């Protein structure tokens, strides 16, 4: 298969939102969100930071599992430090959403209890979400756009 990379780049540009490709549109959107009380600065810090720190945590796990890195005190300490960094960004997200970590955990427990009515993991329920499960709402909402 031959790929026309120029055509692909045109396609990517066409399906990219204005705030993602135009600095003025981006700045306008940030101001719009600020007017709505959306904590863009905290949530962007949290989102980018969680992604980066999760990558660092994953890198250590990958090296232990697939590349022979030893399971030793130093590597366990490294994992714990990366997990702490993740928690710092989770705290940023909580502040940006004006929610406590306790509330986040409680909401997660409620969601999982609803998803797994037997109180334990079930492959069927993990693959077949009930109506109203957030993943399905997001998918439906995105599909409608």
Language-model segments: which ranges?
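An amphipathic alpha-helical micro-motif enriched in hydrophobic residues
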Residues: 47-58, 73-108
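Catalytic phosphate/metal-binding cores of nucleic-acid and nucleotide-processing enzymes, i.e., regions
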Residues: 64-70, 77
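Acidic, serine/threonine- and proline-rich low-complexity regulatory regions
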Residues: 39, 71-72
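Conserved small/polar residues in nucleotide/adenosyl-binding loops
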Residues: 139-145
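Long, hydrophobic, amphipathic alpha-helical segments used as structural scaffolds
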Residues: 62-65, 94-101, 116, 120
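Short, C-terminally biased terminal segments at protein or domain edges
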Residues: 102, 106-138
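Extended low-complexity intrinsically disordered regions
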Residues: 1-65
């Amino acid at each position: 298969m031959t790929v026309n990379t120029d055509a692909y780049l045109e396609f990517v540009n066409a399906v990219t939102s204005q705030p993602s490709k135009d600095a003025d549109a981006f700045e306008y959107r940030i101001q719009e969100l600020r007017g709505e009380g959306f904590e863009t600065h905290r949530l962007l810090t949290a989102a980018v930071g969680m992604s980066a720190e999760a990558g660092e945590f994953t890198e250590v796990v990958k090296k232990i599992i697939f590349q022979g890195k030893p399971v030793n005190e130093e590597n366990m300490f490294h994992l714990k430090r990366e997990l702490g960094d993740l928690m710092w960004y989770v705290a940023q997200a909580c502040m940006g959403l004006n929610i406590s970590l306790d509330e986040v955990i409680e909401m997660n427990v409620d969601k999982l209890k609803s998803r797994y009515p037997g109180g334990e993991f079930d492959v069927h329920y993990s693959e077949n979400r009930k109506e109203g499960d957030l993943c399905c709402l997001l998918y439906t909402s995105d599909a409608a756009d």
